[in-house]
C-alpha cells in the first residue's frame, strides 16, 4: 500500500537518475509520453511529502555513440552529441512535470542561452529548497564521463541524502537476471564489493566518486508501482550500496 501524504520521508533531498532507455517505454526509439506522465506523477508524490528532487536523465533513447564511434566518429564528438540528447530529454520531462503543476528548472552543464539555464550549484540548491524539481542535463559538460557519473557528481554537489538509480530490474544481481535464471539479487552491497565483483551497476568513476564521498546509492525497478515513494519513506526496495 502506498504511503499516505502524512508520511515522514527518510530522505529530505534525493538525486534521481533515469536512463534514457527507460523513457522509451514500449517504443524502440525516442520518448514514450506515458512514461513521462507516470514519472511526473511519481515525482509529484515526493514533492507532496516535502522531498526535494534533483533529476538526471541519460540520452540513450535518442543517441547511442558507440556504433558511430566504431565506424570512425571521434569520441569527443559522439559524447557531445550524447550531451545534447540529455538536454532534449530534460526539456520533455520538464514539460510533463509542468503540465502536472510541478515547478521545474532545467540546468545544463554546457551554456545554452535561451533554451535552458547554465548550471549553478547555489541557485540549484535554492530552487530545491523552494520546492522546485531541478533537472541537470548535458552530463558533467565533459566528454568521457557517463550520465551515471554526472548523477553522482550532482548528488554530491547538492548535498543529496541518496542517489536513486532507476532501472528495469529490481536491484543489483550477481548476473544479468534477464539472461541468467539463477542470478542472485543483493539487498545490500558495499562500494568495494560492487567494484571487486564487477557487477556493472554503474561505471567505475561513478562508484568511486560515491565511495570517496560516502554517497549511498539505491538501485530499484522504476516500473514497480510505488517503489520510488516507498524508498523515500524508508521501506526496502531494490539494492542499497553504501559503506561497509
Curated annotation (Swiss-Prot):
Q: List the disulfide bonds.
A: none
A single Gene Ontology CC term: cytosol
Keywords, comma-separated and alphabetical = ATP-binding, Cytoplasm, Kinase, Nucleotide-binding, Pyrimidine biosynthesis, Transferase
Activity regulation: Inhibited by UTP.
Q: In which pathway does it act?
A: Pyrimidine metabolism; CTP biosynthesis via de novo pathway; UDP from UMP (UMPK route): step 1/1
Reaction(s) catalyzed by this protein?
A: UMP + ATP = UDP + ADP
Coiled-coil region: none
Q: Which GO terms describe its biological process?
A: 'de novo' CTP biosynthetic process; UDP biosynthetic process
Q: Which InterPro entries match?
A: AceGlu_kinase-like_sf, Asp/Glu/Uridylate_kinase, Uridylate_kinase, Uridylate_kinase_bac
According to its UniProt record, where is this protein mainly located?
A: cytoplasm
Q: Which CDD domains match?
A: AAK_UMPK-PyrH-Ec (cd04254)
Q: What is its EC number?
A: 2.7.4.22
- Write out the GO MF terms: ATP binding; UMP kinase activity
Q: Which HAMAP family match?
A: PyrH_B
Its quaternary organisation is: Homohexamer.
> Which family is this protein grouped under?
Belongs to the UMP kinase family.
NCBIfam families membership: pyrH_bact (TIGR02075)
Q: What does this protein do?
A: Catalyzes the reversible phosphorylation of UMP to UDP.
Quote the PANTHER family the UniProt record gives. Answer: URIDYLATE KINASE, URIDYLATE KINASE PUMPKIN, CHLOROPLASTIC
What protein name applies here?
Answer: Uridylate kinase
Which gene codes for it? pyrH
Amino acid at each position: 500500500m502506498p504511503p499516505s501524504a502524512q508520511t515522514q520521508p527518510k530522505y529530505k533531498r534525493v538525486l534521481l537518475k533515469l536512463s534514457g532507455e527507460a523513457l522509451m517505454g514500449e517504443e524502440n526509439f525516442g520518448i514514450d509520453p506515458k512514461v513521462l506522465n507516470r514519472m511526473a506523477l511519481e515525482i509529484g508524490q515526493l514533492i507532496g511529502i516535502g522531498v526535494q528532487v534533483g533529476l538526471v536523465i541519460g540520452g540513450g533513447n535518442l543517441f547511442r555513440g558507440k556504433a558511430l564511434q566504431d565506424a570512425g566518429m571521434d569520441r569527443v564528438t559522439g559524447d557531445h552529441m550524447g550531451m545534447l540528447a540529455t538536454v532534449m530529454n530534460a526539456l520533455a520531462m520538464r514539460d510533463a512535470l509542468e503540465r502536472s503543476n510541478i515547478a521545474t528548472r532545467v540546468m545544463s552543464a554546457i551554456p545554452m542561452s535561451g533554451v535552458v539555464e547554465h548550471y549553478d550549484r547555489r541557485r540549484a540548491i535554492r530552487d530545491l529548497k523552494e520546492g522546485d524539481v531541478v533537472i541537470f542535463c548535458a552530463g558533467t559538460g565533459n566528454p568521457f564521463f557517463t550520465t551515471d557519473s554526472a548523477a553522482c557528481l550532482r548528488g554530491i554537489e547538492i548535498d543529496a541524502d541518496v542517489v536513486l538509480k532507476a532501472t528495469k530490474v529490481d536491484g543489483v544481481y550477481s548476473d544479468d537476471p534477464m539472461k541468467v535464471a539463477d542470478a542472485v539479487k543483493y539487498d545490500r552491497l558495499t562500494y568495494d564489493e560492487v567494484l571487486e565483483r564487477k557487477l556493472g551497476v554503474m561505471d567505475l568513476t561513478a562508484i568511486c566518486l560515491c565511495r570517496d564521498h560516502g554517497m549511498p546509492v539505491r538501485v530499484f525497478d522504476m516500473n514497480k508501482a510505488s517503489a520510488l515513494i516507498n524508498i523515500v519513506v524508508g521501506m526496502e526496495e531494490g539494492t542499497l550500496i553504501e559503506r561497509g
